[in-house]
């Protein structure tokens, strides 16, 4: 077999679950926790976990009673459940717990930027779950 003309990208099938749910979103949450710890200390990470644990029960929504303690063992469905609430969970944590690393105005802007990043992620994720796209929807992915 002559593999010099093999296009590996045409030979593989994209797997949204492993790429988006278990890959990128997992990384985004893990990195956010590291940033919170660096900017605000462990108290901000603990508050994030507490907020996740205090989400009221709702049919079909996974409750994270231990926060993100077991994030390495989360399933794609658990990450999708977290996507539904995470934008609300992180809002205000930086404003509340920022240390001397930034002033109040910068903390407010950073907090808002983090919330917007998760909001934009959710919009992109929902769009990517579709089978077919309109040209206008694809324009939203451009930087």
Where are these regions (language model features)?
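Domain-level detector for long, ordered catalytic/regulatory cores in large eukaryotic signaling
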Residues: 1-85, 92-93, 97, 101, ...
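General structural signal for alpha-helix termini and helix-helix connectors
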Residues: 88, 92-95, 127-133
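Alpha-helical bundle/repeat cores within regulatory domains of eukaryotic proteins
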Residues: 100-143
């Amino acid at each position: 077999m002559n593999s010099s003309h093999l296009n590996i990208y045409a030979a593989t099938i994209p797997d949204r679950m492993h790429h988006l749910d278990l890959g990128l979103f997992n990384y985004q949450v893990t990195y956010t926790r590291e940033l919170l710890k660096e900017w605000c200390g462990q108290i901000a990470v603990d508050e994030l976990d507490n907020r996740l644990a205090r989400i009221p029960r709702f049919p079909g929504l996974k409750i994270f009673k231990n926060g993100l303690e077991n994030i390495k063992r989360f399933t794609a469905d658990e990450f999708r459940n977290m996507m539904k609430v995470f934008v609300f969970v992180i809002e205000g944590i930086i404003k509340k717990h920022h240390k001397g690393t930034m002033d109040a105005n910068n903390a407010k802007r950073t907090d808002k930027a983090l919330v917007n990043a998760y909001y934009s992620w959710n919009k992109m994720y929902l769009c990517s779950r579709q089978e077919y796209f309109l040209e206008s929807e694809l324009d939203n992915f451009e930087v």
